[in-house]
Every structure is written in C-alpha cells, then in structure tokens.
A protein has these predicted regions:
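Glycine-rich phosphate-binding loops of nucleotide-dependent enzymes
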Residues: 2-254
Length: 254
C-alpha cells in the first residue's frame, strides 16, 4: 500500500532525528501532510509522537533530517518561525486566558489597534463574530470570560484564533480529550470544516476511535521509530492497536 495523495505535501518531515542526552526520542522518522487532510499520530507515552511534532511547532529543534513546507526546505528554530510558515499549534491546555472573553483571547498578543494606537475592541469583537460564524455558527457567548464556556466552545475559540491568523498547517493535541459526546461531535464538525477549507491537520492522539473517526491517515510510532502509516478506511481498530502495542505492521501499512 502506498500514500494515496499526489502532488506536493503542505509539509514533509523527512528522516527526522531528535536526541536528549544521548537517548534518541525520534529516530529517522518521516511523515507528510497534504491540504485538506487529517493525519493522526499515535503511540504510547514516550513513543516520540509529541517530540516529533514539536520540531514542527518550534518547541524543539531537530538534530538531523529536513522539514519541507510546500516542497521547500524550512528552518524552524522557535514558535515564531513556525507561525511564519503558517503553522499553528492548539495544545491540550488550549493556552486561553480564562478571565478574558473570546475576542480578547483570539487577539491576545496580536491586538488590533485604531488610528490612535488604542486597542480596538469593537473591531476585534466584529472580527471574532465573523470567524466564529464561519467555524461554529451556534457560538453566541461573545461577552463572557472563556472560563464560563464549555470544553467544545473553548476549543472553538482556540481553533478560531489559529485560523484567523492564516494557519495552513494545524497541530492539535488530543482535541477531544475529556469532552462529552456532544462536545466531541462539535469538535469533529470543526475539523471537517477546516479540512473543507484546505487546511492540513496533524492530530496527536491516544484514542484509536477518535483517529478512526477524524483522520484520513494514521502514523504509528513506537520507541521513537515509525512503525508505519495506514489509510484509516483500509484498516480496523485492531490493526492500529497491533501497530501500537506490538509494532506489528498490517499488509495495508507503508
């Protein structure tokens, strides 16, 4: 089985290695991502999936290998470099300021100002309403602190922030963790909307069911190495479980 995608990937991590104190956390791993695609990264704690993706978000630096964005080699040394390549990360903690409303969170650190140099709260709220109308039309709580929002609504704000600032590559860390069924469905619909807009999404996950529901492809890592990549529609939960636990590659993997 081969990669079903053709053309130039949005991003390609090629032969990446990362070591800490002589221990290889990531050992010659390659993975790619195409526009309008969700790729799940799975593996036990310590498998290396988060470490691998953090070299794309700028949190870690690779020791070897290449990062290509739209087919061109890119140097990513910190999160600012990543944002310069339209890469945004949504961490499990969401990094939201609980005491601020949706608009203040969306523009936190990147506030809009008027011609006098003052923060333009009216314009920020209007822009927030516009982007939320696109992503989550049911969102109505614009004037309350995000601490008063549900988990799915908070996730909506974090996603809107990334999309507003022109993310083309989105890294999501267990976006449905600790959410109920209704909230999980809300996030699933958000992800489908982002796919339709041509974004590429890396989903760091532990939950196989979430991967089967949300992802197009799944890459499994074990002990810092890539076990294989599968097209989700071609495999079962048990196939992926075997890759995670045993490092066993099904015939459909590549």
């Amino acid at each position: 089985m081969t990669n079903p995608n053709t053309g130039t990937p949005l991003v390609e991590l090629r032969d990446i290695s990362i070591a800490f104190g002589g221990i290889k956390a990531v050992d010659h791993v390659s993975v790619d991502l195409y526009p309008g695609e969700v790729v799940g990264l799975l593996g036990h704690n310590g498998a290396g999936k988060s470490t691998l993706i953090k070299c794309l978000s700028g949190a870690y630096q690779k020791d070897a290998g290449q990062i290509l964005i739209n087919g061109k080699e890119a140097e990513i040394n910190d999160p600012r470099d990543a944002r310069g390549h339209n890469i945004e990360t949504i961490y499990q903690t969401l990094a939201l300021a609980d005491n601020l409303d949706a608009a203040s969170n969306l523009f936190l650190g990147r506030e809009l100002v008027n011609s006098f140099g003052f923060v333009d709260e009216t314009r920020m709220e209007a822009e927030t309403r516009k982007i939320m109308g696109r992503l989550n039309p049911n969102f109505k709580k614009f004037n309350v602190p995000v601490s008063a929002l549900s988990g799915g609504q908070r996730q909506s704000v974090a996603i809107a922030r990334a999309v507003y600032f022109n993310a083309k590559i989105l890294i999501m860390d267990e976006p449905t963790a600790a959410l109920g069924p209704h909230e999980t469905q809300m996030v699933a619909e958000l992800i489908q909307e982002l796919k339709a807009q041509g974004l590429g999404i890396f989903l760091i996950e532990h939950d196989i069911h979430s991967v089967m529901k949300l992802c197009d492809r799944a890459v499994v890592m074990k002990n810092g190495q890539r076990v294989g990549c599968v097209n989700v529609k071609d495999v079962t939960d048990d196939d992926i479980l075997g890759m995670i636990i045993m490092g066993k590659k099904p015939p459909q993997a590549y």
